Amino acid sequence: METSDGGFRKTTLWKGGKQRIGNRELLGSKTLFRKQLWWFQGIAYDIPIVKHAKVDRALRKLTVNKRAQTIIGIKRSGRYMPMIRRMLEEEGLPLDLAYMVAQESNFNEMARSRMNAVGLWQFIASTGRRFGLNINRWIDERRDPLLSTQAAMRYLKHLYGIFEDWPLAMAAYNCGERRVQELSLIHI
């Protein structure tokens, strides 16, 4: 089924009332993480693209001011994107979530932020442990691309369960669920 919404073409991913992703039938609405595809300029997206002046400025910053860094990230992405997209597909999560890694770490598994977030998915230690990563003086699984991607999927599912909206879940991943909840209360 296809509908039009705000200049985007929307395609649902199930037919006949059965909730499906690929050949898998899903049980319960909470397990259906990929509900539709959004088509914009001939490209399919799991999460709608919002045209906004701030988004345009951020894109300009990446393509002009930080062009060299962006190119490095694109080159690194070839090592990780196939694995990340395959894992997202297997979990029924939007494939567009793979692009979060570009924002979080520029596809650098050794990245460390000023807030001590580490790895591709930039987990702080407490959140990493909360979602199953071993972090101690001998091992730091935040730097393991496979294990950190599995933990990121658990965390993103958790956030989607709270917010039931991918843009909000992504914002909460970046700045914390409490911060997004507080801002949601202010702007409701």
PLM feature spans:
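Substrate-binding/active-site groove segments that recognize
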Residues: 115-138, 145, 149-156
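Solvent-exposed loop/turn segments at secondary-structure junctions
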Residues: 105-108, 127-130, 176-180
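Catalytic and binding regions of secreted/periplasmic enzymes and modules that target cell-wall glycans
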Residues: 157-182
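Short, functionally critical alpha-helical segments immediately adjacent to catalytic or ligand/cofactor-binding
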Residues: 93-109, 169-175
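An acidic, Gly/Ser/Thr/Pro-rich helix-cap/linker signature
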Residues: 1-91
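Solvent-exposed, polar/charged alpha-helical surfaces in well-ordered, non-transmembrane soluble domains
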Residues: 75, 82, 86, 98, ...
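Soluble non-cytosolic domains of exported or imported proteins
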Residues: 64-79, 91, 95, 118, ...
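Conserved small/polar residues in nucleotide/adenosyl-binding loops
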Residues: 186-188
